């Protein structure tokens, strides 16, 4: 069985990347590999505290070449937790790719979702190199579109799908047109949009939004959109 890799990546922080990775991992039944070393990571969202551990299973797995043990919880994705020390102890691009492929073979899942640190580093580039789809949330804001434009120029030959995120009820026309211009002439695709909802940012539950049936009323349009994104990813990689 060949595992498909979904890599959630952007060149800017604060765009909703981690939430999207978390929800996609749940919807696809995928382990979530957290390669983020800053605060606000998927690991913290999951309830994992590296401060309470004496070592990092992620760093040990990269060093020893053995698959890390997946952490499991209720109504949230299985997790390989990240660690701040990854920033200064990154494996090479090829070392990262080889490790992720080996782990996926051991886990035997159809999908693996990888959440990355913003920007281009060795460990990030390793994950991108094996991605079947690179999912990038894009708020329709000038500075975020600047970062997206730069990323598309660099990664136009990668399987990139842009997901308009935090979209207000009336989307800003100028930014919508700019997004179209950014992908024009490239194979980069634009997937389903995710509507803005203040409740996403203030929610404290660790469970995936899409694990609740039904979620809170304010989150229901977001949950519907997330399921549409998951379906798009499945069709894209079919």
Report the location of each language-model feature.
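Walker A/P-loop phosphate-binding motif and the immediately C-terminal alpha-helix
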Residues: 2-37
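Short, well-ordered beta-strand core segments
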Residues: 30, 112, 134-135
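P-loop/Walker-type NTP enzyme "switch/lid" segment
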Residues: 31, 35-108
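P-loop/Walker A phosphate-binding loop and immediately adjacent motor/lid segment at beta-alpha junctions
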Residues: 91-99, 150-171
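Inter-motif core of Ras-like GTPase G domains
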Residues: 119-142
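Short, conserved loop/helix-junction motifs that constitute active-site signature segments
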Residues: 129, 153-158, 183-184
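Beta-strand-loop-alpha "switch" segments that mediate conformational coupling across diverse proteins
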Residues: 166-214, 226
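NTP-binding/hydrolysis catalytic cores, primarily Walker-type P-loop NTPases
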Residues: 209-238
């Amino acid at each position: 069985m060949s595992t498909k890799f979904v890599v959630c990546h952007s060149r800017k922080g604060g765009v909703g990347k981690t939430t999207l990775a978390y929800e996609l991992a749940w919807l696809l039944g995928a382990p979530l590999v957290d390669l983020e070393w800053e605060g606000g990571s998927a690991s913290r969202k999951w309830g994992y505290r590296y401060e309470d551990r004496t070592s990092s299973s992620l760093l040990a797995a990269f060093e020893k070449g053995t698959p890390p043990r997946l952490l499991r919880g209720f109504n949230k994705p299985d997790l390989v937790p990240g660690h701040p020390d990854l920033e200064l102890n990154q494996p090479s691009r090829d070392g990262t790719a080889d490790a992720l492929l080996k782990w996926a073979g051991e886990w035997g899942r159809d999908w693996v979702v990888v959440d990355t640190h913003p920007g281009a580093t060795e460990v990030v580039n390793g994950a991108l190199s094996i991605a079947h789809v690179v999912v990038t949330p894009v708020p329709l804001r000038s500075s975020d579109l600047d970062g997206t434009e730069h990323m598309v120029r660099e990664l136009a030959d990668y399987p990139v799908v842009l997901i308009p995120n935090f979209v207000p009820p009336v989307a800003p026309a100028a930014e919508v047109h700019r997004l179209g211009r950014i992908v024009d002439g490239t194979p980069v695709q634009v997937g389903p949009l995710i509507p803005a909802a203040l409740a996403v940012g203030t929610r404290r539950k660790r469970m995936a939004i899409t694990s609740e049936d039904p979620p809170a009323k304010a989150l229901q349009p977001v949950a519907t959109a997330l399921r549409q994104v998951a379906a798009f990813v499945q069709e894209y990689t079919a």
